[in-house]
Amino acid sequence: MGFNEFIGKLFGNKATRDMKEIKPWVDKIKAVYPEIAKLSNDELRAKTVELKKYISDSAAEEQKKIEELKGTIETTELEDREGIFAQIDKLEKEVLEKYEKALDDVLPQAFAIVKDTARRFSENPELVVTATDFDRELAAQGKDFVRIEDDKAIWQNHWIAGGNDMVWSMVHYDVQLFGGVVLHKGKIAEMATGEGKTLVATLPVFLNALTGNGVHVVTVNDYLSKRDSEWMGPLYQFHGLSVDCIDKHQPNSDARRRAYMADITFGTNNEFGFDYLRDNMAVSPKDLVQRKHNYAIVDEVDSVLIDDARTPLIISGPVPKGEDQLFEQLRPLVERLFEAQKKLATQYLADAKRLIASDDKKDQEEGFLALFRSHKALPKNKPLIKFLSEQGIKAGMLKTEEIYMEQNNKRMPEATDPLYFVIDEKQNSVDLTDKGIDLITGNAADPTLFVLPDITSQLSALENETDLTEEEKLAKKDELMTNYAIKSERVHTINQLLKAYAMFEKDDEYVVIDGQVKIVDEQTGRIMEGRRYSDGLHQAIEAKEGVKVEAATQTFATITLQNYFRMYHKLSGMTGTAETEAGELWDIYKLDVVVIPTNRPIARKDMNDRVYKTKREKYKAVIEEIEEMVKEGRPVLVGTTSVEISEMLSKMLAMRKIEHNVLNAKLHQREADIVAQAGQKSIVTIATNMAGRGTDIKLSPEVKAAGGLAIIGTERHESRRVDRQLRGRAGRQGDPGSSVFFVSLEDDLMRLFSSDRIASVMDKLGFKEGEMIEHKMISNSIERAQKKVEENNFGIRKRLLEYDDVMNKQRVAVYTKRRHALMGERIGMDIVNMIWDRCAYAVELGDFDNVKMEILQTLAMEVPFTEEEYNKMRKEDLAEKTFEAAMNNFKRKTDRMAQIANPVIKQVYEMQGHMYENIMIPITDGKRLYNISVNLKAAYETEGKEIVKSFEKAILLHTIDDAWKENLRELDELKHSVQNASYEQKDPLLIFKLESVNLFDNMVNKINNNTISVLMRGQIPVQEPEQVREAAPEPQAPRQQYREEKQDLSDPHQQAAAEHDTREVKREPVRAEKTVGRNDPCPCGSGKKYKNCHGQNA
């Protein structure tokens, strides 16, 4: 007995322990279920109202205290408000804790209600209940599943979802109740494909929606979010819970705001994230769409939290400098360089073949060196890959590589200097050699055009020059830094263009559609709309392909999906495959993965991998296997890793006259139709990775008899998870099926990470071309290679998250302060803190004249102490004295502002109040005039104090936005510059953390300084009532100036999962929408005409 088995026997494995913990909950649900099943339809709905009340009452006391405290804010002195807000925050936390406890109390009843509602819909074509206002509202909106007859609402059991007429036929199994408990507890439920994850989510969604705080159901693409909101919606709406989907409405619209106010909101991960960013660019509270982040269930959670983890959401705008033409200018040089390297690599390969075939040992050594050079020149060269698969060749080349790698790569330049540039596939890097630099510099006047100067030694040499004045030194320094920045940009552009030519292949990593370069998601084969490679790489590919190079942009707001989802009070997720990444999900998100057993045992047969020497043999074997399956009458799903391979297999099948469908990034519009047919007899479907497709393949009875769906993988993926997802397409709900992967030593995974050992095994066993090896040892070896890649990818993601965590702390602080300013409730408290900060800063300046100047410039007042007092008193006391004087000065000025404005406001309101909602009030700080928009009614009711609040808000928002935008740019530049620290044996992350603190402090000082200096000087020029004019609407920045994108910061060969599905939805049947004539009876059942009832606003 092994150690792990012994420990397992002693303590039980994790799956057993998880089930043991959840089973009592499921037993409770099953115990209350008979009682719930006995209730009439009306009683069942009344039960939901009862549970809502129970939850609401559990924290009623705390809610009452919060309202009381909020009522005291306006009458409390500014300095003392902080204590009230701290109490409110503490009480709000207590409310959430009370709600969680109450939810646990009612869980068995709530889950039983959902299960029995599902049963009633599946067993009855119609459910008749007493009509409520909510039922009438739904009927008036034209929902096809409910109609009103007198005082009754008739709910049907079929409705339109995703363009299809769905008849409800599902009831929750016990394993789905297990899954529901796991999700409610804030964990990840791993459930096999076909186990009904969508139905499982109805349980915790219903339960948590009872609080009224909102539940977000997050999907990976807009087709699924719309379909699921329509499919599951009536189950919730039957119980009076509102349901909406943000993807059905335009950003920043009232409809989207209403969608967030619904009890249950569906949407894609991107749109939730972008709405958060847009909210933090809003200039008025009425522009906000989201409310507090309460509870989210993420579908395909591994795809969102792991694959998308290196992909920040970014809202950017145009940069003031003109369009950058550098990529266009340098493209011909790089093209020449690439062609020269291609010739060189071909020559080295020809020399290698000739020399290795010789009997002379010296010739053979020379031959393997030439082969190694050809490999370093262009590792993806197809003739090279084919030659490396021959017996003993790869082993010989690896031996040569070891010789040159000895003593920390000491001899490597001997091998690589004859090349123009060197490619390292594993590191995803391209480095120019001196020979390459000479070629692109050519006849240029400056031979150092593409060589970065040693800026450190140049600067220290400048410091030591004695014959220059300080001013001349500064001018020279500026010149050096400018020259360095220009050259750095030029070298960076060359490097990115080289990557575009040498490491990115069209129709593999990207496609060109309608004159645009679009990234293909390597996990799912979908086009990733709106996503661009970062760091100039996308522009480089655009230049290579001869399409329009997009202009450079500047970031206005950004967040990674991980940091967005960490804001939720409670987070859970569902997926078919998370166990392999359980460590990462726990490490980063503290999310526990619980594997839910299948409802029926899996009958799928998973076979060992079949390994061939070359891709040609592998594809030949794949076609023969497909042919065999078609003869047996089994449907076949062929999983490929790129568009190119799917098209090549399609041509091979067409030559054999085998009918088939292709599903890839170029043909995704037909996806739903193709998947619907994929389970029919002898149907062959070729699909680029099926991860996250969200549609089950259903089998006909004759197919089940023939052996079920056959899955054929044409290549092992870097991630075991994607392979498991492909396998999981077969064998749903106990159906028969099989899966097998065909692998060749030329595949990327094998070439980069695993094939040395397998190649030597095949050589020893004397395998000839065309022969195949199938052994558990080989499959294990491939899995080890995948683990190696996964660990490497985890390291990259963790590192990126550590960088983003630094930015996230700053983002939270800035956005909190911005929200205070926007809502106006806590703005006074923030301004008091800013004034204190400026006072404390001023008294620390050391020299009395400097202190005097600082107080005069920032606080717009005389220094409140003498020079003698300054030298004698403690700094804390001086700060306190200055603060007291500053606050008195500030109150006097704001009171004066309100007094001057009030007579004018009073007159305008009383005489023209019906004409204006908002008016413009001009305020000046002596340098510039600010036109402040103020609500006329609020200004009248507060005797002018609202003007002060609006002035404070406008100045603070403007200052924060400018400073944050600048800070983001500086953080971006810092992130690039700290990477050089690794050459000095320093940790770039540590340097980044230290430097970013300085940047943040500078930004906070800038915000405080600029805000206070304007507020302290603000005054209203005396104005006559007839000069008052109506305020224009708040200036929301024009949307066309902004670009919303997901930038991919990752290695292109480890792309993240798709999030935008633009498939064509089938035409809806005519009966989907009920049109009501203006004079027809209103569908709500009120008896009034439609035009006089719900049709008034239509």
From Swiss-Prot:
Where is this gene product found? Cell inner membrane; Cytoplasm
**Highest rank taxon of the organism:** Bacteria
Q: How is the cofactor bound?
A: May bind 1 zinc ion per subunit.
- Return the EC number: 7.4.2.8
Compositional bias annotation for Basic and acidic residues? 1041-1051, 1058-1077
Q: Which UniProt keywords apply?
A: ATP-binding, Cell inner membrane, Cell membrane, Cytoplasm, Membrane, Metal-binding, Nucleotide-binding, Protein transport, Translocase, Translocation, Transport, Zinc
Protein name as annotated: Protein translocase subunit SecA
What organism does this protein naturally occur in?
Phocaeicola vulgatus (strain ATCC 8482 / DSM 1447 / JCM 5826 / CCUG 4940 / NBRC 14291 / NCTC 11154) (Bacteroides vulgatus)
